[in-house]
Regions:
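Carbohydrate-binding surfaces of carbohydrate-active enzymes
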Residues: 253, 257-259, 297-568
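Aromatic- and acid-rich polysaccharide-binding/catalytic face
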Residues: 218-224, 274-309
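The substrate-binding groove and active-site-proximal loops of carbohydrate-active enzymes
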Residues: 41-51, 76-89, 141-157, 225-241, ...
């Protein structure tokens, strides 16, 4: 892999001119070798999964039962600031764990789960013995004691030493968690402007501004000076960038083959900091980097449809970012919090993962196992086993989608909820990268209520949209759910994803398949946690192909695999 040449000018200039270089580009088609080396299904662990021999033995026993559940495990550095000797001992545990995983054919990455810190509500005093520096402080003067000022030398030295220790594991990727952010560090950030407002940060900013600022004078001045607020934001992002740079430098010094990754939310306002961090990681490591967009929708009780929209939001953020070539892996955050039995089901994990792959993600990050408040037997039976049961379909789907793009109608706004509702009519929609059939207004996205109109009215809308912009696939049966065609560069239909939006089985579902080569004889329906079904292709007098999917299970998904897909 050649080293990437990225700009290393003053970050201040980069941030102020970010709108200039934030150009959209098409989804890069990676070399086959690059794709083959990348893990698809990644299982994130907490530190408690590997901090003792007993805990690791419990987790390893589950993975031995269901090794197909994942291609890679992320070990965690933890979310506290213990003495470095504690980290050193954990590194030795990780090394032994990595050897255990290798025997199962599972790779290893490391997640730096604490840089700035997540917030005081997430922590107790235990485990913070090494913290001798000030916490993150808001513009109101409130300090988050279990978070860290990003510029204090003692903290940066600690991060440097910690990163060098964990690099000894020689992981595939070092992932920096989403606490590397300039907001959401409770209670400091409540009713606060962004950034850390401690004495250290205020002095550093004052030195750059050649003017002495206090917390009160800076806050007051920002109220009427947007350029000052912009410079403060650039300063705050630079604070984060330096931390990412240190971690990447220390990792490369010990393990130059290791890649770097970043986890961050996918709201539009995040695009600048995400781009700056990822560019820094790519420049320092000399390799393409990995990115995990995410945020919210952690429970089944309230969020089953939100989990689908969340993957659509991740796809949309890929488009907002312009899908830069220095990012190799896009993996949605499929997460449960808390990770208890009642929080989330394996079925919803699989559906969110499937949706991410349908709309352009090329990997899946799953954080769904508990820290041993639930028994290993329950976690194996209720989560890891069912995920393993659906893993083959996810792998086949990702493989079949290589070098393809999704096709559908775009939305003219930044909210994917109307697009999702419209998509449940069985009309292809496109939240992210892909081949657009046109952009619809909000009024056009609400032509009929799928819940209050007969199926004949829904079918008329499908026909009208198809006449407006013919899709590679037209649904001809009563169906409530997403329909996602993916095509090759020449327009040839490659896969058709279906996600049943009802809590009952649907089918049969008759589909008209356009752009299907005349020599294609094999179409296989592959549904999550079901046996594959070979489908008969019918052709009319014009050679247009039709198939009938016999059924799609309640709140389940699957795809039509067109032709034979060879897998290494």
């Amino acid at each position: 892999m050649k080293h990437l040449s990225l700009p290393n000018d003053s970050l201040r200039n980069v941030l102020l001119l970010s709108a200039v270089f934030c150009t959209l580009c098409s989804l890069p088609v990676h070399a086959e070798s690059d794709v083959d080396e990348a893990p698809l299904l990644m299982l994130r662990f907490s530190k408690e999964h590997s901090d003792t021999e007993e805990h690791w033995a419990n987790m390893l026993s589950i993975l031995r039962q269901y090794p197909e559940c994942c291609d890679e495990v992320w070990f965690s550095t933890g979310t506290t600031v213990p003495p470095l000797e504690v980290h050193a001992a954990h590194v030795e545990m990780m090394k032994r764990g990595k050897a255990d995983l290798q025997r199962l054919g599972i790779g290893t990455s490391v997640q730096v789960q604490m840089t700035i810190g997540h917030g005081d509500s997430s922590h107790t005093p235990a485990g913070w013995e090494a913290k001798t520096w000030t916490g993150w402080t808001g513009s109101t003067g409130v300090e988050a004691r279990y978070c860290n000022c990003p510029r204090q030398p003692e903290f940066l030295n600690y991060i440097r030493a910690m990163a060098r220790l964990y690099a000894e594991v020689h992981p595939r990727t070092v992932w920096i968690d989403d606490d590397l952010r300039y907001d959401n560090h409770y209670p400091a950030t409540r009713d606060s402007r962004l950034g850390c407002w401690c004495a250290t940060c205020l002095k550093a900013f004052s030195d750059e501004e050649h003017r002495m600022w206090t917390r009160e004078t800076l806050d007051q001045a920002m109220a009427s000076d947007p350029q000052l607020a912009t410079r403060w934001k650039a300063f705050s992002i630079e604070s984060l960038r330096r931390i990412a740079e240190i971690i990447a430098q220390e990792t490369k010094a010990v393990s130059p083959e290791t890649r770097m990754g970043y986890q961050k939310t996918f709201w539009d306002e995040d695009s600048t900091v995400v781009r700056v961090i990822l560019q820094t990681l790519a420049r320092v490591s000399g390799q393409r980097v990995d990115y995990r967009p995410g945020g919210s929708a952690y429970y089944d009780r309230k969020h089953p449809a939100e989990q689908i929209v969340k993957s659509m939001d991740a796809a949309r953020f890929m488009r907002v970012m312009g899908c830069p070539d220095y990012v190799a892996t896009w993996c949605p955050e499929v997460e449960s919090w808390p990770r208890h039995y009642g929080s989330r089901t394996a079925q919803s994990v699989l559906l969110e993962a499937f949706t991410g792959l349908a709309y352009g993600m090329n990997a899946v990050s799953m954080y769904v196992t508990d820290r041993w408040e639930e028994t290993p037997e329950l976690q194996a039976r209720s989560m890891i086993g069912p995920v393993a049961d659906g893993a083959d379909v996810l792998r086949r789907y990702a493989h079949a989608n290589r070098a393809t793009e999704a096709v559908g109608f775009r939305c003219d706004g930044d909210d994917n909820h109307p697009l999702y509702e419209f998509g449940t009519l069985g009309i292809p929609v496109l939240p992210g990268m892909g081949r657009s059939l046109g952009t619809l207004t909000r009024d056009e996205l609400s032509p009929v209520s799928i819940y209050g109109e007969p199926s004949s009215a829904v079918q008329r809308v499908r026909q009208q949209m198809d006449e407006r912009a013919p899709s590679p696939v037209l649904c001809l049966s009563p169906y409530v759910g997403l329909l996602i065609p993916r095509v090759l560069a020449d327009g040839t239909l490659r896969t058709v994803g279906l996600l049943n939006g009802r809590i009952d089985t649907q089918g049969p579902i008759r589909l008209c398949l356009r752009s299907l080569p005349s020599d294609v004889q094999k179409v296989t329906w592959r549904e999550l946690r079901r046996r594959p079904v070979r489908l008969k292709i019918e052709r009319d007098e014009d050679g247009v192909a039709y198939v009938s999917v016999p059924s799609v299970g309640a709140w389940n998904a699957g795809f039509l695999e067109i032709g034979t897909v060879s897998r290494k």
